[in-house]
Amino acid sequence: MKKIKIFLMMLLAVLSFTACDDDDDSKQSIISEYSMNDQQVAAQKAKSGKDKAVLLVAFGSTWTNAFAAFDDTKKAYEDAFPDADVYFCFSSDICINRASAGEHGESRNYYEPRYLLHAIGAAKYKTVYVQSLQVSPGEELADLVAAVQKFA
C-alpha cells in the first residue's frame, strides 16, 4: 500500500510540473497577430486616406476556388463602397489555420475578426461596417456579434 501511495504521489508531482508550462509563446503570437494587422490596416488607411471601413466576415474555406469567390466578393464590395477600405477575414479558426498552411493549394493568411476590428479601431476609422457572409447562424456568428459589441 505504501509503494502505491508513493507511486501516485510521484506521478502526481510529474504531471503537475508538466502541466505548469509557461504560455509565453501563445501570448507572443497573439501580440504579433495584433501588431501585424495594426500595421497593415494603418498602412492601407494612410495610403487611401479614407475614414470608412467595411469588414467582411466569412466562415472560411481552404479551397482555391473558394478563395477566388472571396476575392470576387471583396472586389464587389470595393466597387459598391468606393469611399471605404474593405477588409476580409475568416471566423473559423480551423479554416484560418488550414488556409495559412496551404492545405488545398495556395497559402493565404486570414485573421479573426477581433484582430481586424482592433486594427481598424487603432487606425481611427470614423465609420465601420461589419458584414457577415455566414450562410447559417452558428457559433462563429455569435462570436462575431460579441466581438463587434466589445469593439463598439
What are these regions (language model features)?
Residues 21-152:
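Active-site-proximal alpha-helix that buttresses catalytic centers in soluble enzyme cores
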Residues 1-8:
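Bacterial N-terminal signal peptides that target proteins for export
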